[in-house]
Structure formats: C-alpha cells, structure tokens
C-alpha cells in the first residue's frame, strides 16, 4: 500500500512516500495532495526528523527504504548511506569506492529519491560544496546543522 506524509521542517515542507512500509521518497517539497496525506504512517520517522532538525545526532539506518533504480545508482546510494552525521566525503571518494568517475557519482546523486536517509548532502566537491538537487543553500544549512560545514574544502 502506498502512503503519503508531509513533515514541516525548519527548511520547508518534506514529502514522504512509503510503499509496503518502506520509504521510497523523501524530498524537500510539498508534493503530495493533501487529501492523500496520512501522517500516522510516519510517526517513528517523524520523531527521528524532529531530533535531526533539533541538531541531535540522528541515525536513519534502521528506517527501511526501497529503491527502484539501476545497480550502479544502488551501489552509489549504498556507499553514501555509510557517511554519518558530522562527516563529509568528496564525490571522488565515493567514485573510488564504487569504481567510477566523480561526475557519474554526481549524476547518480542528483537523482536520489530519498534525501536525508541517503545523505547526499554530505558528499562535496574537492573545492567546495558542489551541487544539491534542492539547491546549494539547503545543502549548506544541512551541513551547518550537522556541524560539518567547517570540514568542507575551501569553506574553512
């Protein structure tokens, strides 16, 4: 069964979609028709999001996700899920781990359907922030919240 939820973060609304109790989408937008929203299905995740946005170290590893994508993106997303709160890695680091180019990693991350749970905001360029599907300013705010902005090359 597909369920929709809306969480109000300090950075704007987040839409969540689950299918058979697994998250298939988490995005910074208000994309769900209000009549379809059933926030009761997301109580556990909402508590984690509350902690996250209060600046508390939060681990989303126990939240089940389902990815409908190709094997290459799956490898990239799996590697990115290893990057924990307060850490940053470069596109090059991820590329070396999965055997591809930094540009290919960037393209894969631009298609990430489950933001925060697959923390692509923690992947940065060797010379700065790099891009983010919902804008570099949001990426900056998320890294600031996690206390890791200082670790970004050329931001120090």
From Swiss-Prot:
PROSITE patterns: MGMT
UniProt source species: Metallosphaera sedula (strain ATCC 51363 / DSM 5348 / JCM 9185 / NBRC 15509 / TH2)
Gene: ogt
GO molecular function annotations of the record: methylated-DNA-[protein]-cysteine S-methyltransferase activity
Function: Involved in the cellular defense against the biological effects of O6-methylguanine (O6-MeG) and O4-methylthymine (O4-MeT) in DNA. Repairs the methylated nucleobase in DNA by stoichiometrically transferring the methyl group to a cysteine residue in the enzyme. This is a suicide reaction: the enzyme is irreversibly inactivated.
Principal localisation: cytoplasm
Chemical reaction(s) catalysed: a 6-O-methyl-2'-deoxyguanosine in DNA + L-cysteinyl-[protein] = S-methyl-L-cysteinyl-[protein] + a 2'-deoxyguanosine in DNA; a 4-O-methyl-thymidine in DNA + L-cysteinyl-[protein] = a thymidine in DNA + S-methyl-L-cysteinyl-[protein]
Lineage: Archaea, Thermoproteota, Thermoprotei, Sulfolobales, Sulfolobaceae
GO process terms (BP): DNA alkylation repair; methylation
Catalytic-site annotation from UniProt: 120
Enzyme class: transferase
GO cellular component, as recorded: cytoplasm
EC number(s) stated in the UniProt entry for this protein: 2.1.1.63
Full protein name: Methylated-DNA--protein-cysteine methyltransferase
Record-stated family: Belongs to the MGMT family.
Locations listed in the record: Cytoplasm
InterPro entries, per the entry: MethylDNA_cys_MeTrfase_AS, MethylDNA_cys_MeTrfase_DNA-bd, MethylDNA_cys_MeTrfase_DNAb, MethylG_MeTrfase_N, MGMT, MGMT_N_sf, WH-like_DNA-bd_sf
Keyword terms, alphabetized: Cytoplasm, DNA damage, DNA repair, Methyltransferase, Transferase
Misc. remarks from the entry: This enzyme catalyzes only one turnover and therefore is not strictly catalytic. According to one definition, an enzyme is a biocatalyst that acts repeatedly and over many reaction cycles.
Annotated Pfam families: DNA_binding_1 (PF01035), Methyltransf_1N (PF02870)
């Amino acid at each position: 069964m597909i369920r929709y939820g809306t969480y109000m973060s300090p950075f704007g609304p987040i839409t969540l979609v689950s299918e058979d109790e697994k998250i298939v989408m988490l995005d910074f937008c208000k994309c769900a028709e209000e009549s379809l929203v059933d926030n009761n299905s997301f109580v556990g995740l909402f508590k984690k999001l509350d902690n996250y946005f209060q600046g508390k170290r939060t681990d989303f590893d126990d939240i089940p996700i389902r990815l409908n994508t190709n094997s290459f993106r799956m490898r990239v997303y799996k590697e990115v899920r290893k990057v924990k709160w307060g850490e940053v890695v470069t596109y090059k680091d991820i590329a070396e781990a999965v055997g591809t180019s930094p540009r290919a990693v960037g393209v894969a991350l631009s298609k990430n359907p489950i933001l925060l749970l697959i923390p692509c905001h923690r992947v940065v360029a060797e010379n700065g922030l790099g891009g983010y599907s919902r804008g570099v300013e949001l990426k900056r705010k998320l890294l600031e919240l996690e206390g890791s902005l200082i670790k970004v090359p050329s931001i120090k």
